[in-house]
Design a protein with these regions (language model features):
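Phosphate/pyrophosphate-binding loop motifs in nucleotide- or prenyl diphosphate-using proteins
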Residues: 1-169
């Protein structure tokens, strides 16, 4: 019997919550940020793939799907690079916020980090597909870059954390 508190259920449940949040974020897109819609939909598809992979142990005969991260992660990294090169450089921490879309993307970022922690907890108990963890790790960085890009598109400036030292180079 698998309880709702089982680390496996927690891990794919966090992925499901994240997927719902990405869908909500898509509903907030403005005319300026509408260009993010297709990639956010693709991320939702990939999150379903990750959840599918996590839902059944690899050694279980019902495990019918394995997520492979190489191409999706390379795609995310290309988006991260593009958005980072487009927006003004920052050396300090920024406060999550700005436009509605950027704020929602920051929530997606922190939800992704929570999902990553749940996946690590599952990994400490049993073997998992490392490709899922790699993709989820890069996805949180994508959401940070996309949030900054959304603020840029909506002509909102990032707000620097006033007590931050230079942390980005």
């Amino acid at each position: 019997m698998l309880f709702r508190s089982d680390p496996r259920v927690e891990a794919y449940g966090e992925i499901d919550e994240l997927n719902s949040w990405v869908g909500y974020t898509r509903s907030l897109l403005t005319p300026q940020t509408a260009k993010l819609s297709n990639e956010l939909e693709e991320i939702q598809q990939l999150l379903f793939d990750c959840g599918h992979d996590l839902a059944t142990p690899a050694e279980d005969e019902r495990h019918s799907f394995e997520f492979h991260q190489k191409e999706p992660t390379a795609w995310l990294e290309q988006k991260i690079d593009t958005y980072t090169e487009t927006v003004p450089a920052v050396k300090k921490f920024i406060l999550p916020g700005g436009s509605q879309v950027a704020s929602a993307l920051h929530v997606a970022r922190t939800t992704t980090r929570r999902a990553e922690r749940r996946i690590v907890l599952l990994m400490q108990e049993e073997e998992i597909n490392q490709d899922v963890l790699t993709f989820i790790n890069r996805l949180s960085d994508y959401f940070f870059a996309a949030a900054r890009y959304a603020n840029y598109l909506d002509q909102q400036q990032d707000v620097l954390y006033r007590n931050s030292k230079d942390v980005f180079h």
